[in-house]
Amino acid sequence: AGEEIVLVKWIGMEGTLRIIREEGAALAERFAPGFLNKLEDMRDEIFSDRAMEIAGRNGVSAMHPIGEGGILAALWDMAEGAGIGLSVEMKKMTVRQETIEVCEVFHLNPYQLTSTGAVLMVTPKGEELKERLKREGIPAEIIGHTTEGNERIIWGGGEKRFLDRPAPDELARIYEMKENVNA
C-alpha cells in the first residue's frame, strides 16, 4: 500500500474507435469529416510495447491492462486481485476530448468504455515513471495511490464516492439501443 497508480495512454480510445466504425453514419451527421478522420488516425497510437519496456526497467510492481468495462472495471479488478484499497482522482484520468464528445452523442460513460491499450501501473516511483514515459511521447498521469484495507475511493468534483463493482461495458448499451430500434 502507498504506491502510486499511473495511468498510461488514454481511457476509452478502443471503444471510441469501435463506435466510429459501427456508428460512423450517425456521427457523420454531427461531426466534421476531419474530426472523425483524426480519430481513425489515432488507431496506431493505441498500443505501446515501448511503455511495457519502460515499466519493466523502472520498478513497476504491478500492471493491469484496461479493457472491457473501462478504467472503473480495471481499478476494481486490480484492487480486488491484489487485496488492496485505492484512492484515485477522476480529473487526473487521461481521456481525449474526442472520446467525451462521441460518448455524449450516445449518452455513454467514457470511464466505463473499453480501453484496450491503456494500462494501470503501480509503482513506488510514480513521478519518475510518468516523466520517462512522457519523454518517449507516451501519455502518462499519476491518478492516485494504493491504500491499506480495501476501500476503493474515487474523488471527483470535490466529492468522495466509493467505486462500485464493475458494470457492463458501455458498448453493450449501443448494441441494446440498436436492438430496441430494430425490434
What are these regions (language model features)?
Residues 1-41:
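Phosphate/diphosphate-binding glycine-rich loops and adjacent basic-rich segments that engage nucleotide
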Residues 6-10, 114, 122, 144:
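Short beta-strand segments
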Residues 136-183:
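Acidic, Ser/Thr/Pro-rich beta/coil linker or hinge segments at domain junctions
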Residues 11, 16-21, 74-76, 152-156:
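Short acidic, glycine/serine/threonine-rich loops at helix termini
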Residues 21-25, 76-83, 103-106, 131-139:
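Short, solvent-exposed amphipathic alpha-helical segments in soluble enzyme
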Residues 122-128:
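Helix N-cap motif at beta-to-alpha junctions
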